[in-house]
């Protein structure tokens, strides 16, 4: 866990604006049972970098609990919270955290919980919704940012883009390993949502990509092998195959991945934020031209000599 703090401090020293923490459960490869806990740790060891949840999974929280935890982090960090919320990622997690809920239906929880949290931050509020009901209550404490911390929604579908704009939320998107056309699709959906809702609110639009900077073939090989390993371990989570032992997703042997287009080295290098500093700069300019306001650097978690490799890639990225 210590290397995550090292990365956060590198990010702050390198001029990054926000550091993000996820929420996942019962998975050793993404140890993040509560994003507010790890952000509290990072808050105590940093001074200025903002602290975001990417994202709190709406269905796993009670609105009162979520409002209070988020507000407490905003309070103790001196008003640095970026409040990101989403539907959740893997069906395996829903089967354990919210039995009976299909991942494809989880957006309904997002649409109910966010307005409730905002009302609780304002003061006394009674809620009678589809998924939660509670008598008059409030958030204790309340956030120090007014009227509330910046809001973010993770979006990859028209219904979520539309909800984000309706509720004045910034938007973060992740094209996974797909090509630039996927980013273009998200921007199109965002623009359509803005137009549909009267063109009165224009959010900050953030895009996340796996990132690795390298100067030679050895660095390239390490990065490609790391992302292939990552994809091989998490394929069963996306497909809900259930091959998880003691929290670790089963690793598909790399030699079995050869020849499959979604693991092709050249495709991955082209689609992801991989390459020399000059190459990555040109890729970033392309996203900037598309209309992406913030870039989220997603580190490779399977690379050899992790702290050293993170440091090299981070340092080069920050130059």
What role is predicted for each listed range?
Residues 1, 56-63, 145-155, 212-214, ...:
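Active-site mouth loops of central-metabolism enzymes
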Residues 1, 59-127, 171-172, 177-181, ...:
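Flexible, glycine-rich active-site loops centered on histidine and acidic residues
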Residues 1-51, 146-149, 301:
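N-terminal beta1-alpha1-beta2 module of alpha/beta enzyme domains
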Residues 1-10, 156-162, 277-286:
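Short, acidic/polar
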Residues 19-21, 51-53, 81-85, 151-154, ...:
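Hydrophobic faces of well-ordered beta-strands that scaffold small-molecule active sites
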Residues 42, 73, 117, 151, ...:
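Conserved, mostly hydrophobic/aromatic
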Residues 103-140, 181-290:
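An alpha-helical appendage that flanks or caps ligand/catalytic pockets
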Residues 301-319:
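Single conserved hydrophobic/aromatic residue that forms the stacking wall/gate
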